[in-house]
Amino acid sequence: MKLLPSQTDEVSLAAFGEEARALLIRHDYSGLANQFGYALAYERAPSAAIEADFLSAAASPHKVASAAHQPIAVKYFAPNDTGLFALVECTVAVGEGAAVLLELIVTGKGEGKHITVEDISGVAA
């Protein structure tokens, strides 16, 4: 999703994280794919890839003290030549004391920035 120059601040990026998290909580995989795309879709349809990766992550979730609504974390990269600008981390509750991590990545140079679902992960087996 292409961002306006005014949408790269922490508040705006956190709002995109909330939107993505809400879509995932509702299991609206098509809506999430249509809005943000999916960097790790590879040869799969983005919505099917998001669903498969979410189900895989939910099968081995992160342990959390409270599965209640966690704040969105926005982290900015140091200036670089790779085009990486920011990371948006969203904890998504999948059960009592269990959550998966939904990550969105902001890439681009200058004013041309995009936000994309980067990964959905649980605990590595």
Predicted regions and their residues:
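Short, low-complexity N-terminal intrinsically disordered segments enriched in polar/charged residues
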Residues: M1-A22
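Short amphipathic alpha-helical segments, especially helix-boundary/capping motifs
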Residues: P5-D9, Y29, A78-N80
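Generic alpha-helical secondary structure signal
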Residues: V11-A14, E18, S30, A48, ...
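Short, well-ordered alpha-helical segments enriched in acidic and aromatic residues
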Residues: R26-A39
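Short, charge-rich amphipathic alpha-helical segments embedded
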Residues: L40-A57
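Surface-exposed, charged secondary-structure patches
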Residues: D53-A99
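Short beta-strand edge/turn micro-motifs at domain boundaries
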Residues: A93-A125
